[in-house]
Amino acid sequence: TLQYVLPWAEAGILDVDANNAVVKELGKKTFAPGALNMAKKGSKIAAVPVDGWTQMVVYRKDLFEKAGLEPPTSYENITKAVEALSGDGMFGFVAATKTDENFMSQVLEHVLLANGVNVVKKGAIRKQGKKLKASLEFYKVIANASPPGELYWKQSRELYFAGKTPMIIWSPFIMDELAGLRDSAPPTINSDPTSGELASKTGFITNLKGPNNNKGAAWADVRYFGITADADTEEASAFIKYSMDEGYTKTLSIAPEGKFPVRRGNSSDPEAFTKAWSKLPVGVDRKAPLSDLYSED
C-alpha cells in the first residue's frame, strides 16, 4: 500500500529505476495522475500503481428521503440526520471507536481531511487549531450516537445490515455482501439473507465536507506493485507488465468492488480497463456485476 512505497524506496528496499521503467513502458498517461504523484521519488515513480478504492459514507437513502433530510455530504447534514433518526432501536451512527484498529485511523483521517485538516504537514496541528477542534467535535457527535463499546468495521457492518443504523463509514468492499452475495456476512434486515433489498435502499457518498472546507475531501487507498532491489528484475517486470496489461482485468476481478482501476486504459483505448472493470462480477457465493446491483449515480 501507499504507506510503504516511499519509506521502502528511501531505505533501498525498492528498485526505483526498475519500477519507473515499467510505468514508462506501460505509458504514464494511461495511469491516474494522482496514483503516480503519490509514489514519486524525485522525478521517478517508485512503485507501479495497481488499483485503489475510495472510502464512503454508506447511508439509508430511503430513511433520509422519508425524513426530508439532505444526503450526508457534510458535517452539518450528518449531524441533522443523527438528531432526526436516532431512537426506537436505531443508532444515529456507528462510528469507529476502537483506537488500536487501523479502521479508526482511516475513518478519523477522512473526517479530518473533510474539514481541511492536514495532520502530516509540519506545524499543522498548531496552525489549524480551529479546524481540528471542529473536526474532533463532529467526531464526538457521531461517536456519541453510536452504541457503547469499542467499535470497528465489524460492528458497523453488522448494525447497518440489521437495519439498526442509517449511516456508517466503510470501504466499497461492503458492496457485494450488502447485495446478499456473501453467505458469511449476509444482510439481516429481513428473513432472506440473499435479498438485495438493503442494497436498493442504500446510497453512497465519497466526498465529505466540514464547515471550514467547502470543497470537502475524499479518502482513498491505493495499492502498488514494487520490484525490490534483490529481485529478478526481468521476471518481476514481466509479471507486473502482464498483470497491468493483458492480465489487468483478471487482476481487478479478484475483488472488483474494492479494486478500482488506476490504469484506465491503453494506447488503443484510453478507457479499456475502466469499461471492462464495470462489467466484472462481484460476490463470493453468488455473483453479479456492480452495474446490475447499483445505479451509476
List where the protein language model places each region.
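C-terminal lobe and pocket-closing loops
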Residues: E177-P186, N190, T194-E197, G210-D297
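Short helix-loop capping/hinge motifs at secondary-structure junctions, enriched
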Residues: L63-P72, N118, A145, D230-A236
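Glycine-centered hinge/linker elements that transmit conformational signals in sensory
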Residues: V82-S86, K122-E150, L198-G203
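Extracytoplasmic "Venus flytrap"/periplasmic binding protein-like
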Residues: T1-T30, D62, K66-T73, T165-M167, ...
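Hinge/lid segment of periplasmic solute-binding proteins
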Residues: L2-T54, T79, M104, T194-T206
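Loop/turn elements at helix/coil->beta-strand transitions in domains of secreted/extracellular proteins
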Residues: K44-I45, G87-G92, G163-P166, L198-G203, ...
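Extracytoplasmic/periplasmic solute-binding protein
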Residues: K41-V50, Q55, T79-A124, K131, ...
